[in-house]
Amino acid sequence: MTAEDILLRERTSTTTQRPVNSEQYLNVQLATAPVKNFQTTSEISRQTLVDTSNDDVYSIKNLKGSRNPISPSVSNVGFQSIFHTVDHPRSKVSVASNHSLRSNDNASAATSKSGSSQIGESHSVDTVECSNNLSKKLSSDAISITQKSLHSTPSGRYMKGKASGFFNRRNRAHTTISSDPASFLTDSSTLHNSSHSFRNVIKNFFQNKSHRHIGQDAIEPAIPNSLSKFLHSSYGRHKSPSQFIHTNAGQLVDSGTSVYSLNVNPSGVNPNTIVEDPLSGTDPASPNPVSMLHDLLRNLPSLEANYKHFNSQELTTLTNNIWNIFCSNVAELFRTQRIWKLRAKIENFNEVLEFYCILKTDPRVTHSGMNRIISDLKEFLVSSLYNLENQIVFNYSNEDTINNALKRLGVIWRIFYQEVYYDLAAVLLPLDQSIREDGNSTVLKSGNESRTHINGNYSIGFLLLMCFRDSIVLPCYENFVNSNDGISKSFQLYIFNQEEESNVTETDKLTLLQCFGILSTIQSNDRNQRIIEELLAGIRMSI
């Protein structure tokens, strides 16, 4: 072995056993192969500050395409390079994105050089930043997906502004502020665009709120006038059966529409069948008198305030309808119903009657004034008394009493004077003052008798007694007029005969004495009044 071989072996062993300097190793590695770290702090800043409201697709691609200078760039591969020609220049957004990528890559390289002196600290920082970058990248992807879904909904603009505002505040709390001055401009423009978008949403939401009723008045459905039905003639055709009962040969006729309808069926007709007036054309489906009265009471203030604007025909129709409604409800008093069982208060009936008197005395309706009111009331009372008589006859349990004329008159008088008379006087009370003020009224008499001029006290009470006298008493005892012995003597003999045959008692005679005595106070100075005075004399002679 030569001296040269020995020297060569020593050099080789020295080179192999020489300790490795970490600084030299790091420098060599940095020069030949850069350390693969995850220092993407600037990249995170770009994700936060990129304006995604204008071009979401390009912004997402640019964020995903950021790499180290040595790694391949997305802009240099794939379909994007196809459009990078003279005929198809790149968009301004793409150019601005690549420019920001280059500046941020240089800053990243400088940061990696300054941090390579401390490998332990660099390794720990890289680990923390890796986890932060991963979470922030997921958050950025979630924002992009949310923005895309919001664009597909009708209210996407409004919800996009709210969602982007929330995520931007959250990202600013967990992201370091970039040192790039352009990032502040980008962030301020994003806030301005979000605010502008929110204002547009508010305008779209509320631009028609203050004018939503303008232009819609013409298409609104017409509301029917509640007063028009009272001005229609068909509404007044629902007449009370008491107004035409005297034309039915004494049979009891009931409309069946009243709340106090009778259950009597003397003619064998189906009780569910409504008996109609052939002259009135009453609709079987018409409302009952109670509902019509309540409807009238609800509209009475409006009618009183507006009746002066009606023409003559409307006033006449309104007057007839009000009177028919009033009579249909008051007729229940002649069906052995007391006043407290009626479906309206006494004050309500008085108000309706007062308004009827106002309409009836209007020159556009009639020129007869109070005389026409008394004539209408008399017609109603006479027909209602026929109803009362028929009802008592068909409902009285003792046939012997009903078949005797004296006893039957006593029963009808007691019911009329003890119940109907005072209840009816309370309902017709407003007419008392009107009649007393017009004391020289001319009452239309029935039959062929002339008009009789009545002086002195004339009230509703006298009118009620007069109607009872003419409709109930005189038809039964008028045959005594043709007697040769005189009315009073013939009537006395008749009473003595009935005491033996029909067992007429002193109570029955006293009842007739009361009846004829009260009827004689009418002082009408006519033929009917003279007959009552003769009958009163005959009953006195029989006691």
UniProtKB/Swiss-Prot annotation:
Phosphoserine modified-residue sites: S59, S139, S144
UniProt entry keywords in alphabetical sequence: Cell membrane, Membrane, Phosphoprotein, Vacuole
Chain spans, region Disordered: 93-126
Topological relation to the membrane, as annotated: Peripheral membrane protein
Listed Pfam families: HbrB (PF08539)
Swiss-Prot/TrEMBL GO biological process terms: establishment or maintenance of actin cytoskeleton polarity; fungal-type cell wall organization; regulation of cell growth; TOR signaling; TORC2 signaling
Positions where Phosphotyrosine occurs in the chain: Y58
GO cellular component: cell periphery; cytoplasm; plasma membrane; TORC2 complex; vacuolar membrane
Cell compartments where the protein resides: Cell membrane; Vacuole membrane
InterPro entries in UniProt: Bit61/PRR5 (IPR013745)
Composition bias, Polar residues: 94-121
Record text on subunit structure and interactions: The target of rapamycin complex 2 (TORC2) is composed of at least AVO1, AVO2, BIT61, LST8, TOR2 and TSC11. TORC2 forms a homodimer. Contrary to TORC1, TORC2 does not bind to and is not sensitive to FKBP-rapamycin.
Role of this protein: Component of TORC2, which regulates cell cycle-dependent polarization of the actin-cytoskeleton and cell wall integrity. TORC2 controls polarity of the actin cytoskeleton, which is required for orienting the secretory pathway toward discrete growth sites, via the RHO1/PKC1/MAPK cell integrity pathway.
PANTHER family the UniProt entry points to: TARGET OF RAPAMYCIN COMPLEX 2 SUBUNIT BIT61-RELATED
Family to which the UniProt record says this protein belongs: Belongs to the BIT61 family.
Note: Present with 1960 molecules/cell in log phase SD medium.
Name by which UniProt lists this protein: Target of rapamycin complex 2 subunit BIT61
Organism: Saccharomyces cerevisiae (strain ATCC 204508 / S288c)
